[in-house]
Amino acid sequence: MPPKKNPLGLNALQLKTLTLFQALAALEDHASPAADEPGAVVVTDLPRPHGDHFHLGRGVVASRDATGLANPAVWTALARKGLIRTTGPVGTVVVTAAGLAYQTGMGDLLHQADH
């Protein structure tokens, strides 16, 4: 039997936010390995939108798809499911190995851009 889609029952905003955390975790400018948790990544320096979008590496994300980055309830829900941990200063998150591996099905949030 194929794996269940969204086995933790995340809502759309939680899925979008986790997708963005996963993308940030892949960028050297925003992430580093977590010293205390094998397979986890510390994400810092969350991007700030300008206008209706923000840049994520070579990609662009619509601001409307990133509201969860500033929503404490979303962070709490993702932490409760074991996908992230909040730590240190505001705007710092540890994406757990489970969070990095979770299939959100929302990779289309990231659009390639030339500017």
Predicted features, each with a name:
Residues 2-67:
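Short, amphipathic alpha-helical interface elements at domain boundaries
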Residues 3, 80, 98-115:
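Short, amphipathic alpha-helical interaction segments positioned at domain boundaries
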Residues 43, 53, 75, 97, ...:
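Generic N-terminal initiation segments characterized by hydrophobic and/or small/turn-forming residues
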Residues 63-81:
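Short amphipathic alpha-helical interaction segments
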Residues 79-89:
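A short, conserved structural fragment
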Residues 91-96:
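Minor-groove-contacting beta-hairpin "wing" of winged helix-turn-helix DNA-binding domains
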